[in-house]
């Protein structure tokens, strides 16, 4: 019988001396590192365990070691300029025999931890045609694996049944079932012995004990004995010594504020306590140099009941609630085990909890500048927008962690020929770190990690000189509930989302814009009188929109870097049911007019609709993390109901642009294979298809794939990434939308084009591809993309590379495309 004691992290390989930098210069350069003989473990995993590496190659082309060349060029230049090149390059990968020996030992230890006790590792250095170039070849003979046969827990007999069940039934091993003769022993099938997996199991048992009241348990409380009943299998016995079971005792909040008046107050913190064990813990607070903080914030944040059994999970939930308010810069929650008390000699122990926090400055004022592609007011061309904003924030306006923010912004946009638009906007918002009545019960029903309520108002006015349009005012109001189910899964419920828009026209509106959108009226363009009227209404009539929306989001990716993880989002909304009900029951009983009264005698149009969409994004790191494969798939459908047969303009879908299908400009793609009329032509479509889809669509499908590779490190304090991408997608009219009329031909009668048809949709997908550059600072990413059309579904551009490599699309933006 072989007995091993597992009480620490996996064993480390014994290190041997390596060469100094000066002595490395006399060694040959490593051309390639090979690993062979590994059948059970992937090569990528083994490469992560060794330090002997060759220089990176561009696109894996032999000899194309761009980063080494950059480094050597810096050596040649010297000085500060040379230092900059060396910092962005990669030093030559010289052979280090001591490092190779250490890698052999690392691989041997790694294989032993993976259950291959008899694995043999060797390394050969093979000279190439050039004497200064070598290949390092690691040869692996894995030998037979060792399997884990059983896992027995000792010391669980005195634990509460719920804690026992959690430990036994939630093992990290997939094929583990309790044996008949011993309920605390698991029979494990088809599981290779892995030391890291056993350590993970030990950590899981620790969590179960700490969440079951055993606050003093540590890693030393669990020891694993490994037995070898057969040469190819192990039995593991975990001895658990949980110690004493604790309850939450007295709770002391200590709050430090940013003021310097040295004031101290001790308000009452009123929370329920559990006195069933013969002791009623107290909850107290000491607040220094902070005049605004209310004890109600502390009461809501407390996620455990004093007097109940100790749970580390509930303690961490309290910390998350405190930090989620945004009122604190620092939080620290500590169980005071040394001060634990037992009110009765034979009674249970109570552990006091010390909660220390530090509040942030309440008032903050910040200015910002920003660049954007205008999408607010019915664009017809890609525009570069520049703006300035000013934001005031009060981090604790009502004393209970409520955050007030007032943002104002002004922006202008240009198409490089002239100033095309001016926009002013303001948005006050109030974020509450709790759910308002009557939604507070959702927190208890779903056992949420964190909750917020956001109330916001918005106002916007804008002028579009190129379209001869202006928006006198667009007013909005929103009540949103934010529910965090886990750290990565959240729900957003827009209980109220109201907008009132009052557009107006300027001189020459008809000539510059309307005639092109509606067509010449000769049987082409938009011929349906209902849709013609609705298009005019989009740009000339006041409108009212309301929506009830639910969004479910799972996000594990960093929102800025997006190097790994995912963002999965699904949303469904029903719109304008409120004005529909008011129209039917209050304003025109028994009939529908699709209008409701507005201000000053105006009538407001509304269009009921349903809308659902799915947005899936996945980020896969490649190699050693220098590259990322980004994938995105999007699908959305909007469907009108009631009298109107189109959805509101701002709830339609558009395709094309820097974050969509990049071979086209902003909103230039679709609907379907149709092409809108070009300005000034009246009868002919644009020759290059560069006319925005003003109508939008009811159905949208898109897919994107992008490879991002870091090519330069820390040049101008930023990482430089080269990207290659392929995008595809389009938008279509839905079944109720009248669509665009096409003239009759000898082969087919006139019909509405732009409609979604399953048989023709694949041929109507636009495809674009290109290269891009990302300049990534720590908190800021600049994006440049150059894209070409691979397949244009419009009638005049139905060939692949019809224009060769002429007329590419250049997109500039902030942040990654997706």
Please place each PLM-identified region on the residue numbering.
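C-terminal soluble interaction/assembly domains
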Residues: 304-309, 394, 746-749, 756, ...
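Flexible, small/polar- and glycine-enriched "cap/hinge" segments at structural transition points
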Residues: 719-722, 729, 734, 770, ...
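Sec/Tat signal peptide C-region and signal peptidase I cleavage site
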Residues: 9-13
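Bacterial N-terminal signal peptides
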Residues: 1-5
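Gram-negative/organellar outer-membrane beta-barrel architecture
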Residues: 166-167, 172-180, 191, 291-292, ...
């Amino acid at each position: 019988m072989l007995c091993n004691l597992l009480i620490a992290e996996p064993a480390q390989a014994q290190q041997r001396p390596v060469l100094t930098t000066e002595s490395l210069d006399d060694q040959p350069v490593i051309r390639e590192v090979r690993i062979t003989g590994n059948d059970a473990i992937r090569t990528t995993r083994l490469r992560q365990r060794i330090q002997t590496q060759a220089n990176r190659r561009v696109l894996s082309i032999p000899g194309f070691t761009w980063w080494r060349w950059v480094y050597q060029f810096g050596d040649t230049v010297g000085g500060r300029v040379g230092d900059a090149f060396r910092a962005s390059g990669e030093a030559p990968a010289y052979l280090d025999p001591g490092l190779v020996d250490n890698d052999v030992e690392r691989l041997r230890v790694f294989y032993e931890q993976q259950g291959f006790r008899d694995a043999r590792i060797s390394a050969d250095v093979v000279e190439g045609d050039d004497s200064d170039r070598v290949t390092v070849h690691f040869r692996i003979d894995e030998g037979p694996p060792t399997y884990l046969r059983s896992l027995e827990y000792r010391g669980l007999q005195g634990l509460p049944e719920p804690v026992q069940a959690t430990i036994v039934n939630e093992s990290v091993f997939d094929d583990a079932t309790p044996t008949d003769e011993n309920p605390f022993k698991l029979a494990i099938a088809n599981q290779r012995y892995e030391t890291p997996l056993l350590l993970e199991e030990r950590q899981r048992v620790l969590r179960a004990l700490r969440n079951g009241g055993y606050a003093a348990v540590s890693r030393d409380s669990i020891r694993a004995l490994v037995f070898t009943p057969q040469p190819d299998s192990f039995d593991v016995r975990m001895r658990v010594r949980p110690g004493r079971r604790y309850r939450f005792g007295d709770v002391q909040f200590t709050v430090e504020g940013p003021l310097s008046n040295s004031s101290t107050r001790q308000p009452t913190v009123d929370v329920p306590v559990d006195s069933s064990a013969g002791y009623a813990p107290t909850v107290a607070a000491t607040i220094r140099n902070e005049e605004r903080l209310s004890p109600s914030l502390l009461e809501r944040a407390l996620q455990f009941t004093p007097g109940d059994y100790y749970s580390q999970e509930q303690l961490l939930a309290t910390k998350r609630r405190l930090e989620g308010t945004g009122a604190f810069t620092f939080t620290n929650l500590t169980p005071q085990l040394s001060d634990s008390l037992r009110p009765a000699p034979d009674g249970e122990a109570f552990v006091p909890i010390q909660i220390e926090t530090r509040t942030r400055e309440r008032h903050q004022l910040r200015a910002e500048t920003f660049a954007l592609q205008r999408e607010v007011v019915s664009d017809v061309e890609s525009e570069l927008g520049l703006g300035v904003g000013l934001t005031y924030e009060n981090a604790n306006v009502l004393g209970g962690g409520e955050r007030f923010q007032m943002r104002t912004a002004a922006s202008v946009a240009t198409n490089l020929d002239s100033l095309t638009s001016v926009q002013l906007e303001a948005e006050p918002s109030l974020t509450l770190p709790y759910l308002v009545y009557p939604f507070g019960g959702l927190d208890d029903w779903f056992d949420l990690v964190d909750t917020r309520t956001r109330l916001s108002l918005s106002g916007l006015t804008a002028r579009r000189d190129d379209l001869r349009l202006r928006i006198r005012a667009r007013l909005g109001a929103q009540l949103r509930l934010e529910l965090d189910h886990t750290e990565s899964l959240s729900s957003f419920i827009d209980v109220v989302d109201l907008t009132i828009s009052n557009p107006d026209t300027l001189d020459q509106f008809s000539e510059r814009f309307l005639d092109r959108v509606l067509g010449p009226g000769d049987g082409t363009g938009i011929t349906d009188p209902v849709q013609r009227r609705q298009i005019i209404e989009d740009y000339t009539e006041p409108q009212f929109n309301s929506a009830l929306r639910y969004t479910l989001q799972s996000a594990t990716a960093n929102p800025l870097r997006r190097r790994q993880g995912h963002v999965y989002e699904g949303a469904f909304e029903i719109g304008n049911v409120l004005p529909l009900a008011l129209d039917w029951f209050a304003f025109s009983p028994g009939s529908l007019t699709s209008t409701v009264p507005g201000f000053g005698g105006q009538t407001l149009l509304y269009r009921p609709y349903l809308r659902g969409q799915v947005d899936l994004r996945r980020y896969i790191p490649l190699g050693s993390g220098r590259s990322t494969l980004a994938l995105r798939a999007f699908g959305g459908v909007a469907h009108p109901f009631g009298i109107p047969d189109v959805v509101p303009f701002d709830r339609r879908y558009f395709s094309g642009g820097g974050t969509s299908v990049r071979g086209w400009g902003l909103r230039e793609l679709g609907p379907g294979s149709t092409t809108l009329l070009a300005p000034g032509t009246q009868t002919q479509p644009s020759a290059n298809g560069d006319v925005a889809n003003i109508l939008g669509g009811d159905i949208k499908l898109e897919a994107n794939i992008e490879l991002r590779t870091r090519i330069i490190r820390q040049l101008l304090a930023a990482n430089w990434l080269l990207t290659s991408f392929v995008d595809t997608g389009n938008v279509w009219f839905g079944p109720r939308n009248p669509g665009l009329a096409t003239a009759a031909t000898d082969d087919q009668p006139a019909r509405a084009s732009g409609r979604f048809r399953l048989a023709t949709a694949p041929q109507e997908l636009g495809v674009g591809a290109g290269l891009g550059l990302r300049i990534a600072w720590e908190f800021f990413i600049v994006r440049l993309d150059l894209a070409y059309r691979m397949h244009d579904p419009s009638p005049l551009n139905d060939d692949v590379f019809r224009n060769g490599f002429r007329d590419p699309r250049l997109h500039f933006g902030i942040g990654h495309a997706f």
